[in-house]
Amino acid sequence: MGQKVHPTGIRLGIVKEHTSVWYADGRTYADYLLADLNVREYLQDKLKSASVSRIDIHRPAQTARITIHTARPGIVIGKKGEDVEKLRQDLTKQMGVPVHINIEEIRKPELDAMLVAQSVAQQLERRVMFRRAMKRAVQNAMRIGAKGIKIQVSGRLGGAEIARTEWYREGRVPLHTLRADIDYNTYEAHTTYGVIGVKVWIFKGEVIGGRHEELKPQAPAPRKKAAK
């Protein structure tokens, strides 16, 4: 069977950036890595309803800077900033260094793979038909400006006895083009029949020279006249 490389991992350093940026050696590396995993798990648990897409962690000298990318910044900040201050205090105690929290708003959640996967999973948990959930998400993404999108669901779809995989795609999703900006993420829907996995690929355009370039449709080649 053909094996597929992770769409984000293969593009790191080309069109994708690392979500953890710091330097460590020896045992410190393992400690930092475990701390990052614990921080992300803690924030995702605390901010379940805040539509959090990504958490970036930077560690300059003896401090930590955490950037939370969310479609609902008001929920993260809380009334008069009380909630985000509580998060900062908890993370400072957990990481052992002063923590600064930045919040980045996602203005187009329809073009974010994690948020699209979460939306589809939540619909599946509410017993919405999987084809309707996938088609609605694909249409919304294409309407907002995606160049292409593919959604795949796997599991006991519709309560079937045998698990299967279904997918829906519109536009182009060039996984082998390294300069293609493809946002990929997964999420799980916990239904009464078991777990259904959701995968989302969103093609936003090609990155050339450090910036997005609009893809123009190619004109069809002129037909050659047959010799008489």
Curated annotation (Swiss-Prot):
Molecular function GO labels: mRNA binding; rRNA binding; structural constituent of ribosome
Which InterPro entries does UniProt cross-reference here?
A: KH_dom, KH_dom-like_a/b, KH_dom_type_2, KH_sf_prok-type, Ribosomal_S3_C_sf, Ribosomal_uS3_bac-typ, Ribosomal_uS3_C, Ribosomal_uS3_CS
| Signal peptide residue numbers | none
Q: Does the keyword Amino-acid biosynthesis apply?
A: no
- What keywords tag this UniProt record? Ribonucleoprotein, Ribosomal protein, RNA-binding, rRNA-binding
Q: One GO term of the cellular component aspect?
A: cytosolic small ribosomal subunit
CDD domains per UniProt: KH-II_30S_S3
Task: Supply the NCBIfam families for this chain.
Answer: rpsC_bact (TIGR01009)
PANTHER family (UniProt xref) = 30S/40S RIBOSOMAL PROTEIN S3, SMALL RIBOSOMAL SUBUNIT PROTEIN US3C
Q: What is this protein called?
A: Small ribosomal subunit protein uS3
- What is the protein's species of origin? Stutzerimonas stutzeri (strain A1501) (Pseudomonas stutzeri)
